[in-house]
Swiss-Prot record:
Native source species: Mycolicibacterium gilvum (strain PYR-GCK)
Cofactor note as given: Binds 1 zinc ion per subunit.
Protein name listed in UniProt: Alanine--tRNA ligase
Keyword Nuclease set for record: no
One term of GO molecular function: ATP binding
HAMAP family from the UniProt entry: Ala_tRNA_synth_B
Binding positions for Zn(2+) per the UniProt entry: 582, 586, 685, 689
Amino acid sequence: MQTHEIRKRFLDHFVKAGHTEVPSASVILDDPNLLFVNAGMVQFVPYFLGQRTPPWDRATSVQKCIRTPDIDEVGITTRHNTFFQMAGNFSFGDYFKKGAIELAWSLLTNPVSEGGYGFDPERLWATVYLDDDEAIELWQEVAGLPAERIQRRGMADNYWSMGIPGPCGPCSEIYYDRGPDYGIDGGPEANEDRYIEIWNLVFMQNERGEGTSKDDFEILGPLPRKNIDTGMGVERIACLLQGVDNVYETDLVRPVIDLVAGIAPRGYGQGNHTDDVRYRIIGDHSRTAAIIIGDGVTPGNEGRGYVLRRLLRRIIRAAKLLGVEQPIMGELMATVRDEMGPSYPELVTDFERINRIAIAEETAFNRTLTAGSRLFEDAAETTRKAGSTVLSGDDAFTLHDTFGFPIDLTLEMAAEAGLSVDEEGFRGLMAEQRRRAKADAAARKQAHTDLSAYRELVDAGPTEFTGFDELTTEARILGIFVDGRRVPVVSHVQGGDAPGRVELILNRSPFYAESGGQIADEGTVTGTGASQTAKAAVTDVQKIAKTLWAHRITVESGEFVEGDTIVAAVDPRWRHGATQGHSGTHMVHAALRQVLGPNAVQAGSLNRPGYLRFDFNWQGALSDDQRSQIEEVTNEAVEADYEVHNFTTELEKAKSMGAMALFGENYPDEVRVVEIGGPFSIELCGGTHVRSSAQIGPVTILGESSVGSGVRRVEAYVGLDSFRHLAKERALMAGLASSLKVPSDEVPARVENLVERLRAAEKELDRLRLVNARAAAANAAAGAEQIGGIRLVAQRMAGGISAGDLRSLVGDIRGKLGSDPAVVALISEADDDTVPFVVAVNQAAQDRGLRANDLVKVLGAAVNGRGGGKADLAQGSGKGAAGIDAALAAIRAEMGRS
């Protein structure tokens, strides 16, 4: 049974049982605790926790999942995979243990003719949590399982959670006995190679806290209601139903391996374990990489981007070690698309981007690998000659810093060469590099590279900030600096046309210097008296040693001389926008704490005219209801027109008043307090603010996202920018309503209806294509040619037939041709203009010397493509549809020569 059929039967079974089919979520969810989605229930967590009301009582899905902790084991064992599909059924306060067991058992054991998988009930076992007597009774009552095929196991095996705080509960796992060829008797407790887990039924009833291991965490209490979460491994079921030992031999992975085997000088499964590991790495990682890119990740040096980059680079290196010299990534991605596209349409619709990203990484890494490998070999040789088995941290750092080798790749190559790596030395050099980079960035941010140049001015005293009381100030120029060098004068030529950073240090300034999350003011400085022709735009203001204001300027006319008196003027519109943003930040902070509670503590902020960004400590994404509440509370406070008071007081007194302070920040003994609406908001703050909350204008929350583990970010527009954003959305909605010919409030329902109709139409189109193709295949089988005593079906199928469908049709035809020597060759033109083709050769024809993996190359040559496979079945893909007829003629000619 093919994998697509396994998926379909699962979903059909549960839809008939009253479940709503829910599409797979992206493998990227907005949860800082979760790198990738690793279980089918992840998208339903808010429903299990009672944070949101589920739109259905029962749901079913097949979720794409990524697990990468054991990436180094992929291929070495046949148990580890980075991508898998988890089929699941979910109950939200509806049925519980009995219903879950009944539904799982019927699907597994019902005959294939009745929509089930047809497993022999006598080969199925169950495990339950230690004290779950109810589950044991239900297995005996519902499934008729004898007590000797039900085993109790501890928390590590039969109490499920995601490994992080969230829903959890006891579980019951279903195992299939593969027979004595795979190990000793005694059930799952004795041997999990013989007894393979195929389905986990989780009785989700509790919420867990932090913990140190799978069986060491705190149970916080019961969930609002009892739920069911089950997970059936699609790939494991495919292995059993297809009669193969591991996922690499199944119908969705083997084509990737066969593709590479058709190119590499050494084949797969020829007794070379090292080569087989490399083939499996390519087969596994290609699927995972395509899925991750399809869900929006691009290669990078951190987090998910780093995982993707590592997967792609492991593919490339494995191919090189197999002797593949040509670029191969494009063909790998196309094969994954052909096999997985029917289940995950984004692999088809977004293929151009997926392919482009994968090929770009291949191109870049090929250059890196060539140069870096030479350096690695030299370093390894030097290490051996020195009588050592440890590659130095210096060498590992050079590979990383110069050639972009991640430490994981160096460790992998070293292990293959019989060496280890001085990881501690490497980490020390990396830490030193980060320290230097941080220091350089800080120097650039402060707009100076040599503090000694400013020392005289720093010692003379601070810049007096007048911006709380006025926007225009008469001031004296204390110093002029160009690229950190003190100069006596700067003119229009130097400041306006010549490159360089020009700064004025003033004794007094109305300009707010960037700090506390508020960006600097902009405005002008102009000369007075004899220097009145001098004018410059102020584009940035930074603090030097926290006391001097360095005004970055662009001189527009005249010249500025140290000691001159000038007029510094802040742009009033800029300042008004900045005050709106900063006061809006305080309002959003207060609203967050009102809605979420006191644990929503500020972790950082940024505000500029018309915009604010606020980071806060919080575990998990906010619900739509919470976001709406925060926005509403904020705007209610704006409408209330609260007065804004600023005053200076002692730090301890401010804290006793309840003033919020940024954790980790050092404050002086005397602090400035900003109070909005009495108790609504009171914070320590040195920024500029509106005089009353109504001056902020409307606040529109744009979104909420994760910026790190346990830190969330809210972004919003304020004032006129908020109005413009709302006007733009209103115009967009009006345009949609006009195009859809419905009132605005009916647009969501109309769009959902259209999407459902489109999906149904696409599904029906695929069904009709396959029906027509099966009819054509039946006719082709009936009209098989005879060439040299061998029956041949060489047929061009209708357009739009995928590679997976071709394989299914080949199987149908081969079955109809009986046991006489027969060859089936089918070719088609897919929707994306590629030309997939499949060749099957039965055993009788193989005995006559024919091989599918030879004949497939004949087809490939005619359509500008290539292929590979085994003696009985091979497939490939090309790009030249014009050559299809020639390809079929070539097959006939080749048969005539055999």
